Design a protein with these regions (language model features):
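Glycine/threonine-rich ATP-lid/beta-loop region of ATP-binding domains
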Residues: 350-357
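Hydrophobic alpha/beta core scaffold segments
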Residues: 365-369
Length: 490
């Protein structure tokens, strides 16, 4: 709302309606006008049809529709609302006393601020950080050929997701490509990924897509995309009964050798502009072979497969992480170099937390970057005094999972889709891959170390629940996301 002095004033739509009530009810001869907001939340769990004659797609479609009839679980209302109006509303909405009623303020939908209007004030905005193109991957040479030469990596959103789209498009038209297999969890509204897969199928490639229909709140979108893929001749598989497919995988078979992509995040153009995720593209034969094994496991569930390179859940991921941590404990006890560096979204798995406590008690330095839920408590004498945790909330949502183990000077690096949570380790198909390329290892270590050094947007996660900011002078503040962007820009 501009004024005569050239200033711009902002107003909630709620207030526009509130102040314009006389115009809305013109001719009704009311003398007083009052308006109160409320927010009504229903249970989002889906009712799944158990009829064996019903296909998976039909079950999920029916389940999505059942959400409209979900039980009320939360009712937030303007605390100034008159009691008689509140009583009438709760009766009409069938919100009984057992439901959660929360007296709140006048505004309940602050997520709308994610679409904050452009007021022409550049000083109120983040500086523009255009996604970068890696010079090694930005020429005219075949990206598939470049991946065969050595492992390649992309770190979104610092690097452009368009490079990955180029890989898919090249695979779709290349005469040497025989088949493409891919897992899809969440997809953009106008997905270039799906369009490339459809183009590949129309060009005679054998395309198999594993699409997770139970990606929470994206079920309807995934159902729509799966139908389009099927119409184009793509072989679509709807996951494994009882296991959510959360791994981010691409396997491409060619006449001159296969390659694979393993990522920490979704193949989603929108997410790649807001989430920090890491993708490895490799022709390393043992890894590529085992990525194909994962697809075989999904197509033929519960087939016994032994993975030597990959860490795969629910197969053996927790067990292998325990082995890696135990190795650090043993090395420390023998006077060898030992430490653990990790960057994850969440740590809530009791078994792994207790193992990290054991490592700390043995003298192993454990440094973690954890954005979300963290059940690990630092600073307990004799238990966790060797554990440090930094949590970063900045312009990009920290989403990559990186694991580094000292291994007596011969560091072992891993990235993948899993957090250290029971659901990731027990109830999902997740994949973590080792990383052998020295340049990529150096990049991964820089990412974690920058995260640990972040005093501008980082918070000390110590188990108190306060997530205290670092006590650092303004001129010495270190902001990891900004410094990473600068390092990639050089």
């Amino acid at each position: 709302l501009p004024d005569s002095e050239g200033k711009i004033h902002l107003m909630f739509l709620d207030d526009v309606i509130r102040y314009c009530l006389p115009m809305i009810f013109v001719g009704m001869k009311y003398t007083d006008y009052e308006a109160y907001t409320f927010k009504f939340t229903k249970d989002a769990e889906m009712e799944m049809d158990s009829d064996l004659r019903t296909g998976v797609l039909q079950k999920i479609s029916k389940g999505v529709k059942s959400r409209k009839k979900g039980e009320p679980i939360r009712f937030v209302y303007d605390e100034s609302m008159p009691k008689d109006l509140l009583k009438k509303l709760t009766h009409l909405l069938n919100v009984d006393k057992s439901d959660t009623r929360v007296a709140g303020g006048r505004y309940h939908n602050f997520k709308d601020l994610m679409k904050f209007p452009d007021c022409g004030r550049k000083d109120l905005k983040y500086p523009v950080w255009p996604p970068l193109f890696k010079s090694e991957l930005n020429g005219m040479e075949s990206l598939i050929t470049l991946i065969r030469q050595k492992d390649r990596s992309l770190h979104y959103p610092y690097h452009s997701f368009d490079t990955f789209i180029r890989v898919l498009r090249e695979a779709a038209i290349s005469k040497e490509v025989k088949s493409i297999k891919m897992t899809l969890y969440r997809l953009a509204k106008d997905s270039k990924v799906v369009k490339a897969l459809i183009a590949a199928a129309r060009n005679g490639k054998k395309v198999t897509v594993i699409i997770e229909l139970l990606a929470r709140f994206d079920e309807a979108s995934n159902i729509n995309w799966s139908k389009k893929l099927q119409d184009a001749g793509v072989h679509v598989i709807f996951g494994v009964e009882g296991l959510k497919i959360h791994s981010k995988l691409l396997h491409v078979s060619t006449r001159y050798g296969d390659f694979a992509c393993i990522s920490t995040g979704n193949f989603h153009e929108g997410n790649a502009r807001m989430y920090t995720d890491y993708t490895i593209m490799t022709a390393h034969r043992p890894i590529v072979r085992e990525v194909n094994y994962v697809f075989e496991f999904i197509e033929k569930p519960y087939t016994p497969i032994v993975f030597k390179e990959l860490l795969v859940s629910p197969n053996d991921m927790r067990k292998k992480f325990i082995t890696l941590i135990n190795k650090e404990i043993k090395n420390k006890e023998q006077g060898k170099e030992a430490y653990i560096l990790c960057k994850v979204n969440h740590i809530t798995d009791k078994v792994l937390i207790e193992k990290l406590y054991a490592a700390s008690a043995a003298g192993v330095k454990v440094d973690l970057v954890v954005r979300g839920n963290c059940s690990l408590v630092t600073g307990i004498s004799g238990i966790s005094e060797n554990i440090q945790i930094n949590g970063i909330i900045d312009r990009y949502l920290e989403h990559s999972r990186i694991f580094i183990f000292a291994n007596n000077g011969e560091e072992r690096y891993y990235i993948g889709s899993a957090d250290w949570m029971p659901r990731n380790l027990d109830n999902r198909i997740e994949v973590i891959t080792p990383v052998y390329d020295k340049e990529i290892q150096k990049d991964l270590k820089r990412i974690v170390e920058y995260g640990l050094r972040d005093t501008a947007k980082g918070r000390i996660v110590d188990g108190s629940g306060e997530n205290r900011p670092w006590q650092t002078k303004e001129h010495t503040l270190f902001r990891s996301q900004e410094e990473l962007y600068k390092s990639y820009k050089i």
